């Protein structure tokens, strides 16, 4: 399934509609986990970095950041933030399924359910293998994924809509239990100077993976699972957890 057409026009208002996401708490958790493994500086890759919000948080903490994303529109937003902050961040327009770096990094992070956009098992295994290839020995990979429970009971087959002065969107979800694929149909309405609205439509796909399947693919890629947590905690995931944070290591 070709899902990596990803964010286009929505990139312009992505941050506005994500203003309910507590990136600072998320970033604090990542920094704590990195520090616990003795990684307090050096190169860190943000895989599927989007508009660079988390990339900036980690750069502010002293890490030398690389951001990879397949959406030029999202990276354009990220580079505007880079100009404002003055952080020396390298952004690369690459598909996470085929990304290439000039060398290894001490850690890789991937947030905002970016890996759920990988809809085929062999492709997710390949991404894990690429991460393993570019990690320093004993490097770590921290990522989150939406759970099966979240797609089944929280967002699957629901419609989310929001209206603001800066724009409006309608986000329709359709979850297929058999394939584990959640289809997002997004309609975006952005006001123009003439008082009319510009409409843009995008379709995205994400897949729900069981924790058992994720563990299996991590092992096949040659990495070691260290821990799985409920979102932003050090507690194990619950049956009704919507987001799992996963901590794995390059042996």
Which residue stretches match the model-derived regions?
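A short glycine-rich, Lys/Arg-flanked "PGG" loop and its adjoining helix->strand segment in the class I
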Residues: 125-137
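Residue-level detector of conserved catalytic or cofactor/ligand-binding positions
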Residues: 246-251
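Conserved class I S-adenosyl-L-methionine
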Residues: 1-40
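Conserved S-adenosyl-L-methionine
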Residues: 203-205, 224-234
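SAM-dependent methyltransferase
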Residues: 142-215
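A short acidic, Gly/Pro-enriched loop at the edge of an enzyme's catalytic core
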Residues: 100-107
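Residues lining the SAM
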Residues: 111-113
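Class I SAM-dependent methyltransferase SAM/SAH-binding core
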Residues: 45, 52-98
